[in-house]
Amino acid sequence: MGDKEFVWAIKNGDLDAVKEFVLGGEDVNRTLDGGRKPMHYAADCGQDEVLEFLLSKGANINAADKHGITPLLSACYEGHRKCVELLLSKGADKTVKGPDGLNALESTDNQAIKDLLH
């Protein structure tokens, strides 16, 4: 099984499959095809349970992808409040700026997310 299957499981929230990959030796901090890490795909797709599992296995909460985007920024861009809340509770750095020069608070129009970031 390659990156395609691992990324599919992450994006679709198939926690059992993600666990199988990770417990089978997949590195939760490895840069996957596409220049992103598992945390980015989970944050992009609103998969908070997958995020929590990856963090429990040592995933870097502030890892930047090939564009300089962190998982928190990914979750903010996509409007995934539960993911933002989880990442903040686990210590995500909300001051990091993305390639557009905006931090997490500045990068979202979602008021519920803005409230979490204040």
UniProtKB/Swiss-Prot annotation:
This is Myotrophin. The gene is mtpn. The lineage of its organism: Eukaryota, Metazoa, Chordata, Craniata, Vertebrata. It is found in: Cytoplasm; Nucleus; Cytoplasm, Perinuclear region. InterPro entries: Ankyrin_rpt, Ankyrin_rpt-contain_sf. The keyword Repeat applies. Regulates NF-kappa-B transcription factor activity. Promotes growth of cardiomyocytes, but not cardiomyocyte proliferation. Promotes cardiac muscle hypertrophy. Plays a role in the regulation of the growth of actin filaments. Inhibits the activity of the F-actin-capping protein complex. It holds the Pfam family Ank_2. ANK repeats lie at residues 1-30, 34-65, 67-98. One of its GO terms (cellular component) is perinuclear region of cytoplasm. Belongs to the myotrophin family. Its main location: cytoplasm. Keywords: ANK repeat, Cytoplasm, Nucleus, Repeat.
